């Protein structure tokens, strides 16, 4: 049995071996309660540990996030955001029109809000940089700063020197060596969102090589 206590941001559990769980989980304590025998801080780390142990702990974002923006998230978007916050890498293969963009931005915002990441790079088709991504950031994350890294080489490098929360670039721009190196040199971009994964289905392209070098700098 598991429940969420929202005011205290805690998970309440009834488990057969609460002492062992307590030894594995930081910020937890055994309870003398008729329904629950363990309280755990509802953090991302605790949720992952519990899930690895077979306990169906919900993602913290579902209960401890204000979901900012002009509209409320749909149930499917909450599921998307939960998945994205719980996994270091993943694909969202939902159909068109399911508002994947907003779900990804909410997930990124929650991760920033809770100090799991610092800044985000969005790699997306040129036609979507402003019309889709920048527009959606303004719609759902009005408190965040975002900039489009497009134009001359010098302009791109200047944009990357600016203090933004989201840097939005197209695959061709990422393939410019000096631009990619400037992104890596920042040292504070901890999350990369890649739009249109089909762009990278051919490993022999410059776009694929550039993204691989960014995600695996040792190559």
Which positions does each model-derived feature cover?
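The Walker A (P-loop) glycine that initiates the GxxxxGKT/S ATP-binding motif of P-loop NTPases
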Residues: 94
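Charged, low-complexity intrinsically disordered regions
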Residues: 1-57
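SF2 helicase/translocase NTPase motor core
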Residues: 16-23, 31, 55-82, 86-89, ...
């Amino acid at each position: 049995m598991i429940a969420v206590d929202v005011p205290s941001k805690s998970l309440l559990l009834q488990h057969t071996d609460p002492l062992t769980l307590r030894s594995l989980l930081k910020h937890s304590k055994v309870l003398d309660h008729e329904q629950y025998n363990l309280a755990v801080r509802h953090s991302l780390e605790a949720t992952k540990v519990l899930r690895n142990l077979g306990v169906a702990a919900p993602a913290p974002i579902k209960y401890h996030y204000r979901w900012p923006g002009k509209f409320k998230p749909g149930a499917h978007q909450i599921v998307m955001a939960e998945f994205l916050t719980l996994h270091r890498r993943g694909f969202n293969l939902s159909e068109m029109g399911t508002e994947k963009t907003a779900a990804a931005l909410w997930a990124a915002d929650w991760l920033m809000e809770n100090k799991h990441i610092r800044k985000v790079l969005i790699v997306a088709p040129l036609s979507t940089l402003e019309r889709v991504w920048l527009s959606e950031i303004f719609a759902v994350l009005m408190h965040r700063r975002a900039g489009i890294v497009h134009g001359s080489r010098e302009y791109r490098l200047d944009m990357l020197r600016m203090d933004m929360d989201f840097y939005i670039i197209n695959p061709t721009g990422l393939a410019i060596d000096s631009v990619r190196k400037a992104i890596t040199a920042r040292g504070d971009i901890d999350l990369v969102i890649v739009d249109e994964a089909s762009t990278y289905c051919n490993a022999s392209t410059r776009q694929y090589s550039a993204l691989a070098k960014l995600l695996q700098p040792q190559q």
